[in-house]
Amino acid sequence: MKRQVLTQQQYKRANRVMFFILTICYLFFVGIEISNVVKHGQSTMAYVRCGLYVAAILLTGVIVKLLAEKKAGTIAMAVLYIVVYAVLVFGNGAGTLVMAFPAIIGFMIFLNEPLIVIGSVISFLISIVKCILLNRAGDSLSLGFASVVILGSFVTIWCSRMAVRLLIDFSQENQAEIQKAAE
């Protein structure tokens, strides 16, 4: 698997952009919970999950502040997102499965194929577990939607790997051209 080695400055910029992307996702999670409370009535667990999403924003901010120039910051944000994403998915309907895609696309800025593949596979597994739970509950409409998301996850894994590989190749070609011009 391919990965591009980023400089500290590149990690700093990429981690800051990823913080912005994840903050938007977490705020969207809060919106999902609030709309469910409005639609279905008060739910203590919805408020607990909203608290978790706000805590995730704050924790992601701390991660970026402390580890902005390091790969560890990227990994910490990715792990946190997967955990919070799982809480969202298992606490809500099948439609929330699509929230894996903005993060997967965002994490492509790190040009790290293993990061993308691992994140995609974990979201794929979360989708499968959600489908199993929907099937047991007899929710065929949501099960059908979740099945489409699973297929979309598979396509995302494949396509994002291809895109990251090509972007790394482009980067290496550009570096070779710059080095050749410098000589």
List the predicted regions and their residue ranges.
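Short, Lys/Arg-rich, polar N-terminal cytosolic tail immediately upstream
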Residues: 1-11
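Hydrophobic transmembrane alpha-helices and their membrane-interface boundaries in multi-pass
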Residues: 16-92, 99-105, 123-125
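Alpha-helical transmembrane segments and their interfaces in multipass membrane proteins
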Residues: 30-54, 109, 113-172
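Short, charged/polar micro-motifs that form catalytic or ligand-binding hotspots
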Residues: 92-93, 115
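Residue-level hotspots within the lipid-embedded alpha helices of multi-pass solute transporters
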Residues: 93-94, 153
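Alpha-helix N-cap/helix-start motif
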Residues: 95-97, 118
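Long, heptad-repeat coiled-coil alpha-helices that serve as cytosolic signaling/dimerization stalks
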Residues: 177-183
